[in-house]
Structure formats: structure tokens, C-alpha cells
Amino acid sequence: MKITIKPKLAMAGLALAIGMLNAQAAETRKVDVLLVGGGIMSSTLAVWLNELEPGWSMEMVERLDKVAEESSNGWNNAGTGHSALAELNYTPEKDGKIDISKAVEINESFQVTRQFLAWQVKQGVLKNPHSFINTTPHMSFVWGDDNIRFLKKRYEALQASPLFKPMQYSEDHEQIRKWVPLMMEGRDPNQKLAVTWTPIGTDVNFGEITRQYVGYLQTRPNFDLKLSSEVQDITRNDDGSWHVEYKNLKNGSKAATDARFLFIGAGGAALPLLQKSGIDEAKNYGGFPVGGSFLVTDNPAIAQRHMAKAYGIAATGAPPMSVPHLDTRVLDGKRLILFGPFATFSTKFLKQGSLLDLLASTSVHNAWPMVRVGVREFDLVQYLIGQVLQSDDDRFEALRTYFPEAKKEDWRLWQAGQRVQIIKKDEALGGVLKLGTEVVTSRDGSIAGLLGASPGASTAAPIMLDVLNKVFKNKVASPEWQAKIKQIIPSYGIRLNDHPDQLEKEWAYTNEVLQLEPPVSPQRPESIRPADSQGVASR
């Protein structure tokens, strides 16, 4: 059968097609900065840029219908203000000597975070500090002769740094009972224990910080937030800018943005998005997803009697994020205790991701490095298998090593977020497992992404400052940016570890602005009084 298309109908169809193309073209907007991901990293970078270049236009694209719903959500992370006060993996022992360099680096980074948060409070960007940060003592808690020996050596080594002067050490059951009564009830009085206790630790709600950041940014005329929008494609324009296409998951509409600078702070999704951009620098990376679950209690009779983040020591071959800890938390306005994490496995790169994430991120460039790491890190593989096979009874028995009188009926299991451990190509070893965070940038600095996990959100402010140094090097060196950065971070360019007087000054300043009670002097441990029984719950 012959089909005849009338000229008028053909012209109408052509006009419609042209109109659709024009509409699609109209949907492509131009901005100075496009941020993919609505978590703590992207929002921190946006706040930095708002301070340094308030005239720049910015757009944030988030796949979910709210910001801070993946890794930044308080329920999906441990909420620790990582300062290396209790985390034993930051002080490895080499040839009989404790190396504190990484611990000092982590602590210095958190001092930058404290100053950045304090500045945002002063500017009215953040409100009510107790809604997002609270004083919570950090404790290392170990048993067994080898672990006790290690902890004592660690304590002695850290005393060389003014950053760790408030730390106290004890093997005395009665003293430990004063600090953490819940952990001592029902414990064998003859069990050898050792702890370090640092009252100046913090519990941080990174989700709340993110929500307040974005809420403020939305009041700015040059900031636009796109929720329920998933990035579909990333391509390079002829002028060197980036063309990002995304789809609204609610109504199916599509849009695109051209950006002079593109930042990918999408948590576990950062790796596949960097790969999508086609930059050579992303080809050297692979990722292995590791999830975590926690036992949780909100029973006030229990939660009110523990005021610490008590960290143990990781099992052989276990990743740093697996270090068991019994934590005081404040989430959704309620005081809780979380214990874990227990490693879980899923091929998803995000808690609300796809089971195809791992497969989709595997390429000819990173497959061999991933295989090599799998063979060489067999202890890690065995650890993950053992964790996945754990029963509820196994997890509860692990809890009872920290809280001997725990009762099953008071606790529930909560599935927290996903983390993607970095695997990087290595010429000598084929591939290496990178435990930490890593900034990946293109050669010309027009695109950057953040990969990795711990210490993560605790160091968002210094990490984003590092991003600025990499992609806007000349701007950072300019007198205008230098002056503003030093106004926000008074210790910028100074190692506080080498300047005790400056450290004292910054601690007093941030304690006051962030309302971290009791006011603490890092140089005078005797001025520190243990947190009282009301603790965070009274706030």
C-alpha cells in the first residue's frame, strides 16, 4: 500500500521537529560551576565558592528528591568528627615504633573543618551549632596483652604532639568505669583492659550541615538546585566547558547544562560519572563497594548512660571502616547508641543505587588492577565473606564484648550507607587498594571528582580547599582569595602541631562559636572535666 504524505502535514511535522529542537536547546543553560551530588562534599565546595566568588553562577544536580540522603545522611555514617583521637589505624607500628604522622595530618585537617564551621556559624549560614556538632569524648578501648602494649606505646608517642595533649591513659577498671560505666557493668574484674580517653572529641551530623548549607545557598540569586535529576551523559564542548545532560526522574523531562567547571561529589557514583566524562585520569581507577550495618538502641535507660565514641581495634585484614565502636549519637533530635559497623556486601555503589554498578564501572583499564588487588588483599576478601555470613547471634556477641549486659530486645539492626574503596592502577603491583579519599582532576582543571571513603565528611572543608588549589591554582594564589581564605581559616598555611600558641587560640575560638561545652584547652588537660550525665541529651 502506498502512503502519501501531504505537503501541509509534512511542513507541520518539520515545524514541530524544529520547535522541539529549539525547546531542547533552550533547556541547555550555562553556569560557571556545576556540582553533581547533593551531599556534604558538593555543598561544602559550593559554600567555599560562594565565599570566594559570590558572583559565580552555580547549579547542583541531585538524583534523589532531597539533599543529604545518601552517605551524608546521619543514619548512613558513624558521625565521628575524625581527629585520630581514637582510631588506631591512623597510628601504625613500624619496626617497633609508632608512626603518628597520619594521625597528626588527620587532626590538623579537622581543625580546618572546625574553623570553617565556626565561620559559617558567624555568617549565619549555619544555625544552632548543637543541631550538628556536640562534644562527645573519644576513647580507644582494647584488651589482650599485645593490644594493651600497642595502645600504651601509641599514647606515649602522641604525647609529643600538642594536638593530643588532652588524651589520658588508664588500665584501671575503676577509672574506666567512671568514664564508660555501661561498658564495665558485668565485665570480668580480672580482664586486662587499656583505654585512652579524650574529652574533646565530637559527634557530627553531616546531613544537618549539608541541609543548612544548601538551604542558605538557595537564598542566593546565582544558585539553582535540581532534585530528582539523574546525570545521563557528560561530554566536552569545543570551548573546553562541560555539557551535562540529566533526566528528571519524576516526570521524565530532560535538560542539560554547560559548565566552565564540573565537580563530581556523588559518593559511590563519582567513579562511574568520572569514567563517563572520558578523561584519561579516571581510567586508572576502579572501585570495590563495601556496605555497613549497625546495631542501634534508642532505649533512654541505656542511651543516657553512655557518653563516648569507644573505638576498638580492627580485625586482621579488615578495612578501616570496619573498626568496631560503641557510639553515642544524636539523630533526629534523639540520643542513641550505635554499635558496629558490620561489613555488608552489595554490588551497588550507592545505598539507593543499582546492582549493576560494579559491573558497569569495570573496564579494560581497571579490570586487571582490581583482580591483582583481590589476590593480594585476600585477608580482606576473607574478612568480608566472614562478615556477610554472620548471624544475628554473632553480631550480638560482638556487641557484648563492649557492652556485656546488652539485651537483644533493646537493639535493632540498621543498614547504613555504601562506601566504594578505591583501587588504583600501579605499574609495579598491577593495582593497589587506596584507603582514604582521593581527588581526581583533569589536566586542565576543568573537572574534578572525589573518590574514596574514610575520613570523608570530617575533612570536607580541607579537601574542598585542596580541590580549589588543584583547579583554580592562580585564583588561590591571588591576594583576594588568600585574604578571604585566611579570614575563614585563621590557621591557613600554618601547622598547628608546630605552633601550640596558635592551636590554643583556635581551640578557644572554635569552642566558643560552636558551643562545644565544656570549653577545653588542648594544652591544659587538667582544665578538662568529664562530660556530665546530661551530655548531649540536654540540648
Curated annotation (Swiss-Prot):
Keywords: FAD, Flavoprotein, Oxidoreductase, Tricarboxylic acid cycle. The keyword Oxidoreductase applies. Pfam families: Mqo. Its EC number is 1.1.5.4. It is an enzyme of class 1 (oxidoreductase). Its cofactor is FAD. It comes from the Bacteria. GO terms for molecular function: 2-hydroxyglutarate dehydrogenase activity; L-malate dehydrogenase (quinone) activity. HAMAP family: MQO. Belongs to the MQO family. This is Probable malate:quinone oxidoreductase 3.
